[in-house]
Each structure stands twice: as structure tokens, then as C-alpha cells.
Amino acid sequence: MEAPRRLTLALCVACGLGLALTSARAAEDLTPVLSLTPGQVLRLAGPQLGLSTQYPWLVRTPPPGLLVSAPPGHLELTAREALPWRVVETNHGALLVRTRDGVPVKLAWQGEPGQAVSAAGNFNDWNGASHPLTEVAPGRYQLDLLAAPGELIYLLKVGERYLRDPANPDSIPNGFGSWNSRRVLQDEGGAPPRLRRLGWTRQGEGRVVSFLAEGLGADWSWAGLHGNQALAETAVSRAGDTLRVRLGAGPTLGPDRLRFAVSRGTRRSTLQTVFLDSAFVWQDAVVYALMPDRFRNGDPANDAPVRHPDLLGPANWQGGDLAGILACLDEGYFRRLGVNALWIYPLNESTDQAWQEYPEPHRWYTGYHGYWPVHPTRIEPRFGDSLLFRQVVDRAHAQDMRVLLDLVANHVHQEHPWVTEHPDWFGSLLLPDGRRNLRIWDEQRLTTWFEPYMPDIDYGAHPEAVDAMCEVALKWVDGYGLDGFRHDAVKHVPRELWEGLTRWMKAGVPDKPFYQIGETFGSDELIQSYVGPDALDAQFNFNLFHPAREVFLDSTRSFEELARILELNLANYGANSLMGNLMDSHDKARWPSLAEGDLPLSGANGQEIGWTKPPENDDPRTYDKTRLFLTWLLGLPGVPFLYYGDEIALAGAEDPDNRRMMRFGAQLSELERRQLELTAELVRVRRTRPELRRGDLEIVHAGHDVLVFLRSAEDEQGRPSRSLVALNKSGRPQRAELRLPLGLGSRTLELKPWEGRILPL
């Protein structure tokens, strides 16, 4: 067994890395888990590590196989080869390090000599230029790459055409009415070791945390941090398959949490995070997302729909407002549902006109959704005023609810004062080659415009624009007591803005767990690149959201496939990340309408169906299928988000049909009322079971139609707390014979058609 080595080497890191973390806030931040690609240098600045920038740094001698250097202002790490879990110690805190797993892949194309051929996919964020195929013989092209285990989704770009791989018959819908090629990549290195939690006991001022370890063998090692401090070499003992970790009193660096993992050779367990205090963390949240204009009309006096001959009702203002949200708070709607956080869509004053959408068929829309701001801090009069919003936040806080606000930072509407006051802050709509830089999502990721009337802010070239947006954000926080932000279009904004914003928030609100979650569609690597102590806390887990929807609703797809994706997701993000999980969103067709069969899973024609034949819930089984997916959602690690209407299985095709007015009380059918009650019960179970909020996840059964996983954690006294989440996606009764770990024995589960159950053990 190998424990971390502890010789000390002094490495000096220069000052001047920007605003240092305040000591109060720094004590709450965990250092990031670093993933290294063997042979490549990972260069990080002090704030990216969540460590103090005070001079000097003392870095202990790196573990075997890892090179560490400290050029001015940075830390550089290089893995010579695949590594087990490692710890890198500094005098300001310690870091957990691992290497990325990869599977060799060969892509080929047979065509004409002299063609421009490349590959684009989830491995390179759909960049059609970064991975060219080499012409190895006349007309024969080849690319060798190392891809992450799991699903490889890709297309071949030949000239200007994106084509499926003719050598690969496996394909998957792309969500826009077409198809991508797919390969499922298996890691052939053998099963990794597994850690299971056995609880903790008090010992003097400290604790002893116990784990059951399987598959260790003789060549095993461990890595662990208490808060942000490395464990002592003598902290871990082994008796058979039981590991005991002895901790002292709470750490002086970082929160009172144990992060612990084991390795067998270079095969690594998932990282376990044991929460040793019960103070609120965002893993405890169930967030309710609402679009003010489409939620509830509490004050008809401020209704002001736009008049335009070509503007249709679903694209116009509907009358929802802050008074409606306040009424729901006063009536106890959110409290009865059980949610403990609200995400309120943007409240900025919006344009008072209708504007034509660039893509065909060029429909007209208003800014009812909030994403066309014409002022940085003024509240849209149709929603209310600053006094009313302050009442909403205060009333939510009085009910022990936190409030997130949607912050629009990527762009503004052309009527925004910054457009005339600071025209140089905005990128050009025209590219050097003469094309309009509109919706070129990947090739022009950081500069593309969403619409010709929505100028894109060029933060990379204008640091003063970064400061201006950070000042705006702090005004919203200081003015209303916000608890966090949801950030729009994160991948289209340079990281400099998110770093600046996080510095401002940590300096401005150091004494509470301020949560920032972003929206990025792309690879796990791209998503993770915006997450860290110096940037966002989390992003939405779209790389689990999309395949889960498809597997649940496609009878030909197996839960075995989803189980592999889930395990890869856990390996990437950990079982105790703050990633946001969804059933629905304002950008996607609603789950009940997919379950009803009114919309194709491929996404083809989803928007037109919303305009020409809006779906409705005609089949009572749609409510069963919706409860099934909500059971999955509320049983997962991370932070669950309910999009308004999920609790009643509200129907809807794609935007704007997925943004219908919410309905309440007597407006609900009997099936909808029953759905509301059962959703509240699922939320209650989530809120009261620590393993669902703070626990690990182990898949104990994955068949074609039945998936069962075990969630395990500890209660406030350290005793094991466990639940099974069992799901049947078929229209037939199913039986699952389970052999449970941890001495929990065997049991037979009987599941009704489309049934999901959470079973405390």
C-alpha cells in the first residue's frame, strides 16, 4: 500500500494574480479535482486552484510520475503516464489529481484525392477544423485519436458538408431533426476498485470514517483530503476489506468534508465525499425555475401586450409578474411543493417592440422571456418594480428559500444604452470572409450573435466591459439579497468574465454559499472548463439529460446504455457535484409531450408542431411516465431543477409552446392535481433523505427496462442512511431480483408499468 509522500520543496509563486479570496469565503471553497492528460502540461493560476496567492508557495515533493513546477503566478503539472489518485500539497492547501482515461479510436474516409476532411463531435466541441484527417493514400483519409470512454458522437466534415460515417451503421438523433454517428467506447482496463460508505463515529474531538473497499489487491494506494488539507500518512488503516480514516477536529483549510479515493495500480475508484456537518450546501436544494411572464398574473394593471400585425399570441407578453410570484409565496404554493430555492428568469427591462427572428420562417417575437435586456439594472415594468422584487426575495427568505436570478451577460438588445455609450465593446456582425456571424455556435463560439439586433459583448478585448458587467451583477445581489445566479450562454462568453464575476462575488458576498450555475451545450471537457473555484460552481448536466430522455422513451433503447452513461458522468463530475439536473427547460420540448408521442424524439419539426398542433395530455399513462422521470431526477446526485409546470405534467412542444401560462387550483384536472401531490411527495423524500442529497450512487441492476441504483450516505449522527431508486420504463409489470451490497441481502422488486419508487432501507 502506498501513502502520499511528504518531503518539502520550496517553489515560489509570484503575487499579483488578481483579487485573492477573502479568508472567510476561502474557508468554504473546496480545491478542484485536477484531471491530467498524460504527456500534456496543465498550467493553472492560483485562483483557478482555489488557493491563496500569497508569496511564497511551498509545494511538497510531487508523487511519483508527476512533474510539478511553479513559473511566476502559476502551477504547472505534467503526468508522465497514467496515474492512480494523487495528492499535491502546498502550504496553502492540497489538491487531488488524476489522469484522464482514453480509448484509441480510428476514423477513416474513402473519397477523392485532395479533399478537405475532418472530424467534429463531442470530443472536440463540434469544431470542424481542429481534427483534420490525413490523406494516407490517394483518396484515403485517416485520423487516430484518444477519446473518453462512453459515447463518441461525431460527424465527418467533407468540404463544407457534415456526413455520417459510412463505415459505422450506429447513429443517434441530434435533436434537430437529423442524425449523428455514434460509437460506444469501452475501457478494457478491468473493473476499478470500489469504495462503499459505512458511516462514521466520533473519537475524541475527531471522527473515524469507515469504508468497505472491494477490488483493491496488493498494489493499492489511497488519496484523501480533510477540507483542503492532506491526510496524515497514518490516518488510514486497513483490516481486510475495511478502511478506516481517522480525522482530527475540523480542518483549518476548507469545509468539514472528507474527500477520499483508492486505486489499484492505475485503476481508480470514484471519489467519495463525506459531509461532516449539516449546514446547508447547494446539494440540499430543490430548485423551482419560473419565467415570470408565463407563471402567474398577479396584477393585470401592468399588462401591456405589444401590438403588431404579424405577432402571434404565444410570442407576446402574457401578463405574468412579480405580484403573481409573491401571491404564490403568500399562499404557500412553493412550501407545499417542498422546493427550497427559486430560479427567476431575467427581470431586466426589455424592448417594447416586436422583432423578427433571423431563422426561417422569420416569425415575430417580443422580449417576454427576459433575454433581450435594454437596461442593465432596471426591472421590466410589466413585471413590477424594485420594491416588489425585494418583497419577493424577502418573503422567500422568510420561508427558508433561496433565490437565484438569471443574469444575461453574453449579449444585450440593440436598444441597450451600452450599444451607443460603448460601441467598441461589441464584436462585428460581419466576419472577415463576408459572412454574417449569426448562430455559428461552434466555429465562432465566443463571438457569434444570436440575432442581428442582439450585439455580442467582446469581453476578451475589453476588460472594462468585464468590470461593468461585474458591477451590474453586484448591484443585483446587493440590492435584493440574491443567493446566486443562473448564467445564460456560458460557452459563448470568454472565461475572463466568469473569473471576474466570481472574484467580485467572493469579495462582495463572502459569508454565504453563493451559487452560480451555467448553461453550456458541449463536451464534458468544455462544460468543466468553466467550473472551478475561480469561475462557476456548476453547469447543467445536459450530457446526462439528453440520453436519459431518449432511453426512457425509446422502447428499443436499454437502461444498460443509460447505466454506462451515468457511471461515466459520475466519473467525470463525482457523486457530490453541484451539477444541475433537469426534466424540462425553456429550450426543449416538454417531457409529457414526448411521452405522449405527440413529438418525435429526434426533435424534427418540434417548433412547428407547437404553432400548428400544440400537444395535449390525452393519455393518462403520460402522468405515470412523468412521475417515473421525476423519480429518476430526484434520485440523482447533483441539484434537481423543476421547470415550472413539471409538477402538473404541463404539455408543450418547443419554444415558445414550452412556455405556456402556468395553471393553478381550479384550473387543474384531477390527473394534474394528483400529479402535483405525488411530485410534492417525491420532493419531500428528497429533502428528508441525506443519501439522495449528499450520497454516492451504485448501480445494482441494469436491464433493458429496469434500472435500480443504491444511494448511500450518513445521517447527522454518522449512521448509514441508504435508499434504492427503482425504475421501470416499460408498459408491462417487471420483476427484478437484486443482490445488494453491504450485507443488505437479496430482495425481489415488483414494479408496475412505468413505475418509479424510492425505497429507504
How would you label these PLM feature ranges?
Residues 33, 98-113, 172-200, 275-299:
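Low-complexity, Pro/Ser/Thr- and charge-rich linker/hinge segments at domain boundaries
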Residues 700-739:
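Carbohydrate-binding surface patches
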